C-alpha cells in the first residue's frame, strides 16, 4: 500500500497544474512537500502514524514530514506503481501535480526535465543564518534554479521563506531575505510585485494552511491560498500534438506504456501516432491519468498511454510523440538566441555542451557565432564575434550531435526553450528561433 493516497474523481475534474518545488539542498523542500500533502489530506493516516512513531523513537520528530517523501522514493525504486511518478494535492480551485520530487541524485538535471513541464514553481529558501546565504552564493542552487525556472518559461513563482521557527519568527530576517531575493528576481525580469513571499515553518505548520499566530506582522496569503491564486497558463489545444516522453515502461499483459505531459494538441484512444527521432508508428490503445481512464488527453495533461506497435527498446526519454499526419520536427541544425550564464573562460565555435530541451538531453556543438546582442534591447552589437563570454547574449547556430525533436519557440515554447550544461553547471540558456529540419523516413 502506498503512503500517498490517489486523487478522487472530483479532484481530477479540477484544472491541472504542474508544480516544480525548487531551491538549494537542505532548505526544506522535502519537509514542505510532505507537509503540503499531509495538510491537503493526501497522506495515508495509518502509514503516517507508523512514520511518526518511528521518528519519535529515534528522537527525530522533525524529520517525519520529509520521511513521507523518502518513503515515496523507496516505493518508486521498488517499482510499486507506475503513476507514483506523479504525486499531487488539491486546493479549492486546482489539482496540483508535484513534478520531480526533491532528492534525486542528479537534481539539477532532473530539475530541468521537471521544470520544463511546470506551470508554476515554489522556491523554498531557508531563513536559518548561513543557509540562505549559501543558497544565493556563487555555488548556490537558489540562483541557478531561479534562472532555470525563468528560462524554462515559468512565470508563476511563489517563494516560501522556510524555517522561520529557527529564527524565532523574526520579521527583520524575513524582510532581509525578501530584499535580497527581489534583487535577483528583478535581474531575471520577474515582476516582483506579483511574487508572494510567504514566511513559513514546514516543521511547525506555520502559514501553510492557516494563518500563523506566531507572525502577526505578516498580512499576505498562506501557502495554499497563494497556490490557489495562480493564473493558469494558456493551453495550446488547437496546435499539433506534441508529447515529449518522460518514461517508457513494459507492463506484463498490457504492453508498452509511455508517460509524459501533452504539451500541445489532443490525443485520443484509437489515434495513430509516431514517435520521433526513432520514427516508430503505433496506435493508442488506452490513456490513463492518476488511475483514471480517459478517452482523450489534451495540452496540460500528465498521462500514461498504452500504445500498440511501440516496443520499449525502440523508445527513450526525450523522444516526442505526434500524429502521423503532422509529425514532430527532427533538427539537423538550430539557430538560437542564448544567454551565457556561467563559463570560466570564453565560448567559441566547436564548443560542445549538452543541450537539455523538454525531456531530451543531447550533446550539441556550436558551429557558428552569428552575432552578439545587447542584452537589454536585443539589438545586434557585433556581427560574427570571435567568442562569447559570461553575461553575453548571442545568436548562434547549433548542431545536435544526435537526432533530437525541437520546435521554434514562437510555435511552441515548451519545445523551443533549452539550457546548455557542461561540467555539472548550467552554462547558457536559450530559445530556438529557426530550425533546419533533418530528413526522416517514417515507415508504417
From Swiss-Prot:
Residues 14-235 form the tr-type G domain. Mg(2+) binds at residue 30. Its EC number is 3.6.5.3. It is found in: Cytoplasm. Gene3D superfamilies: P-loop containing nucleotide triphosphate hydrolases (3.40.50.300), Translation factors (2.40.30.10). The lineage of its organism: Archaea, Thermoproteota, Thermoprotei, Thermoproteales, Thermoproteaceae. It is an enzyme of class 3 (hydrolase). Pfam families: GTP-eEF1A_C, GTP_EFTU, GTP_EFTU_D2, GTP_EFTU_D4. One of its GO terms (cellular component) is cytoplasm. It comes from Caldivirga maquilingensis (strain ATCC 700844 / DSM 13496 / JCM 10307 / IC-167). Residues 79-83 are annotated as: G2. Keywords: Cytoplasm, Elongation factor, GTP-binding, Hydrolase, Magnesium, Metal-binding, Nucleotide-binding, Protein biosynthesis. One of its GO terms (molecular function) is translation elongation factor activity. It comes from the Archaea. GTP binds at residues 23-30, 100-104, 162-165. The gene is tuf. Residues 201-203 are annotated as: G5. Residues 162-165 are annotated as: G4. GTP hydrolase that promotes the GTP-dependent binding of aminoacyl-tRNA to the A-site of ribosomes during protein biosynthesis. The keyword Isomerase does not apply. It catalyses: GTP + H2O = GDP + phosphate + H(+). This is Elongation factor 1-alpha. Residues 23-30 are annotated as: G1. Residues 100-103 are annotated as: G3. The keyword Acetylation does not apply. Belongs to the TRAFAC class translation factor GTPase superfamily. Classic translation factor GTPase family. EF-Tu/EF-1A subfamily.
Amino acid at each position: 500500500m502506498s503512503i500517498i493516497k490517489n486523487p478522487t474523481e472530483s479532484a481530477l475534474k479540477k484544472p491541472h497544474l504542474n508544480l516544480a518545488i525548487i531551491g538549494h539542498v537542505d532548505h526544506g523542500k522535502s519537509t514542505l512537500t510532505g507537509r503540503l500533502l499531509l495538510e491537503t489530506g493526501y497522506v495515508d493516516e495509518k502509514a503516517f502514524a507508523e512514520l511518526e512513531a518511528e521518528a519519535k523513537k529515534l528522537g527525530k520528530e522533525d524529520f517525519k514530514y520529509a520521511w513521507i517523501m523518502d518513503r515515496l522514493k523507496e516505493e518508486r525504486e521498488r517499482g510499486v506503481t507506475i503513476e507514483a511518478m506523479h504525486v499531487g494535492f488539491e486546493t479549492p480551485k486546482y489539482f496540483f501535480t508535484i513534478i520531480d520530487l526533491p532528492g534525486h541524485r542528479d537534481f539539477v538535471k532532473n530539475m530541468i526535465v521537471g521544470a520544463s513541464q511546470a506551470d508554476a514553481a515554489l522556491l523554498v529558501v531557508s531563513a536559518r543564518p548561513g543557509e540562505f546565504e549559501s543558497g544565493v552564493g556563487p555555488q548556490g542552487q537558489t540562483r541557478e534554479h531561479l534562472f532555470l525556472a525563468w528560462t524554462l518559461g515559468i512565470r508563476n513563482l511563489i517563494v516560501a521563506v522556510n524555517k522561520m521557527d529557527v529564527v524565532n519568527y523574526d520579521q527583520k530576517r524575513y524582510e532581509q531575505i525578501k530584499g535580497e531575493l527581489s534583487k535577483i528576481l528583478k535581474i531575471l525580469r520577474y515582476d516582483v510585485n506579483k511574487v508572494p513571499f510567504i514566511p513559513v515553518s514546514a516543521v511547525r505548520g506555520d502559514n501553510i494552511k492557516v494563518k500563523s499566530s506566531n507572525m502577526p506582522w505578516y498580512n499576505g496569503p498562506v501557502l495554499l491560498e497563494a497556490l490557489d491564486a495562480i493564473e493558469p497558463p494558456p493551453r495550446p489545444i488547437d496546435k499539433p500534438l506534441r508529447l515529449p516522453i518522460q518514461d517508457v515502461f513494459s507492463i506484463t499483459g498490457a504492453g508498452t506504456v509511455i508517460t509524459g505531459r501533452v504539451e500541445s494538441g489532443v490525443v485520443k484512444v484509437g489515434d495513430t501516432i509516431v514517435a520521433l527521432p526513432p520514427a516508430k508508428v503505433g496506435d493508442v490503445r488506452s490513456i490513463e491519468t492518476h488511475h483514471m481512464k480517459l478517452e482523450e488527453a489534451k495540452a496540460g495533461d500528465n498521462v500514461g498511454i498504452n500504445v500498440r506497435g511501440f516496443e520499449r527498446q525502440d523508445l527513450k526519454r526525450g523522444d516526442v510523440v505526434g500524429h502521423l499526419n503532422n509529425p514532430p520536427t527532427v533538427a539537423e541544425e538550430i539557430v538560437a538566441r542564448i544567454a551565457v550564464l556561467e563559463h570560466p573562460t570564453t565560448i567559441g565555435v566547436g564548443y560542445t555542451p549538452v543541450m537539455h530541451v523538454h525531456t531530451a538531453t543531447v550533446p550539441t556543438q556550436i558551429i557558428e557565432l552569428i552575432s552578439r546582442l545587447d542584452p537589454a534591447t536585443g539589438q545586434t552589437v557585433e556581427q560574427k564575434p570571435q567568442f562569447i563570454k559570461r553575461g553575453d547574449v548571442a545568436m548562434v547556430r547549433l548542431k545536435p550531435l544526435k537526432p533530437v525533436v525541437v520546435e521554434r519557440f514562437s510555435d511552441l515554447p515548451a519545445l523551443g526553450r533549452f539550457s546548455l550544461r557542461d561540467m555539472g553547471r548550467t552554462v547558457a540558456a536559450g530559445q530556438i528561433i529557426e530550425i533546419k529540419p533533418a530528413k526522416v523516413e517514417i515507415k508504417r
